[in-house]
């Protein structure tokens, strides 16, 4: 556990801009002393405190901001973003792989003619394959402009506003006394990148392909880093196939079942309730699947189970030990045998 003392030491590092997203917002709002000490450590050194406050509104939002939190990237609607803007926050508009919040917020900005000087862009969990296919912040700019946002506003949100937010003086603009870190686009519609300059020197002409860099993790990982710490992190009790049997998810004696409904482009899910007969039919059709979360840190043997709608697994199973923000083993599948096999595979490969 990182303490306030640890954070004080880290904040002295010149490349540390501030305190990363304060996810434990209930503790901030409730005045938890240990949490507030971490925020105070950043504020005393005049470093920014990033927020993480999905759906926090009203008086709770005021308390959260009063503690010293200055940004939020969890807004999924314009209304939430505008309320946080009114409380003095910078809004980082997120367009990631799962959470795609840019369109509703930009449409709200345009409809209400909202000043954009305290808006910036972020991605927050974007897969490398998506970055390769669609780009990173330049994709945010492209999409915002396609929705009608003026190109100059979108470019400022991608550069100058973000620099202002994080106190990066001398960055984010092309002007005297500013670092000559420049991206040159072919146009301001699809924003295809022509070249990149760092400190005034061309470092990436259009002909360069980033994937040609042959440097691997082995060559850049510090020798002092313990590989064992990350390859020996799966601690689970043996899991029998029966743990994924249908009756574990749909016990006898129950006529209706709660179902998690996935929605594309957002982290928000729907709370659905289906009768047993409907669940059975949708499981056969592949519209529903089984979902389980296995505790993998302390050998507790705890397993959470649910029915999941909209994931698309109709035959087989998918398991992963990456699952923000607790990173237990998650498995979704159509049958016990495949779910058990997928979990065993994750355990065998040590995550």
Feature map (PLM): residue ranges:
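Histidine/acidic residue-rich metal-binding segments in metalloenzymes
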Residues: 2-20, 27-93, 100-121, 132-146, ...
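Fold-independent oxyanion-binding glycine-rich loops
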Residues: 21-23, 52-54, 75, 87, ...
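Active-site microenvironment of metallo-dependent hydrolases
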Residues: 132-148, 152-351
């Amino acid at each position: 556990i990182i303490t306030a003392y640890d954070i004080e030491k880290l904040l002295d590092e010149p490349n540390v801009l501030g305190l990363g997203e304060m996810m434990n917002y209930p503790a901030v709002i409730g005045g938890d002393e240990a949490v507030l000490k971490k925020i105070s450590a950043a504020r005393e050194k005049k470093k920014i405190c990033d927020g993480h406050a999905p759906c926090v509104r009203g008086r709770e939002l005021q308390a959260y901001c009063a503690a010293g939190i200055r940004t939020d990237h969890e807004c999924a609607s314009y209304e939430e973003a505008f309320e946080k803007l009114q409380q003095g926050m910078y809004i980082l508009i997120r367009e990631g792989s799962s959470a795609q919040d840019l369109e509703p917020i930009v449409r709200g900005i345009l409809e209400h003619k909202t000043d954009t000087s305290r808006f910036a862009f972020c991605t927050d969990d974007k897969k490398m394959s998506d970055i390769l296919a669609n780009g990173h912040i330049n994709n945010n700019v492209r999409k915002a402009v396609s929705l009608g946002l003026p190109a100059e506003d979108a470019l400022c949100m991608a550069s100058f506003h973000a620099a202002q937010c994080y106190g990066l003086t001398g960055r984010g603009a092309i002007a005297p006394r500013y670092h000559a870190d420049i991206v040159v686009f072919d146009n301001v519609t699809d924003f295809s990148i022509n070249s990149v300059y760092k400190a005034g020197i061309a470092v990436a002409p259009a002909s360069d392909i980033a994937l040609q860099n042959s440097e691997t993790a082995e060559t850049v990982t510090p020798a002092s880093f313990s590989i064992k710490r990350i390859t020996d992190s799966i601690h689970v009790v043996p899991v029998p196939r029966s743990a994924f049997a249908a009756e574990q998810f749909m016990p006898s004696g129950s006529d209706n079942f709660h179902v998690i409904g996935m929605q594309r482009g957002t982290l928000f899910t729907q709370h659905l309730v289906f009768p047993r007969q409907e669940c059975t039919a949708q499981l056969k059709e592949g519209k529903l699947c089984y979902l389980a979360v296995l505790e993998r840190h302390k050998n507790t043997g705890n397993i959470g189970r649910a029915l999941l709608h909209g994931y698309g697994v109709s035959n087989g199973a998918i398991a992963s030990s990456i699952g923000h923000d607790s990173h237990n083993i998650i498995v979704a599948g159509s049958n016990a045998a495949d779910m058990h096999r997928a979990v065993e595979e994750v355990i065998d490969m040590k995550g």
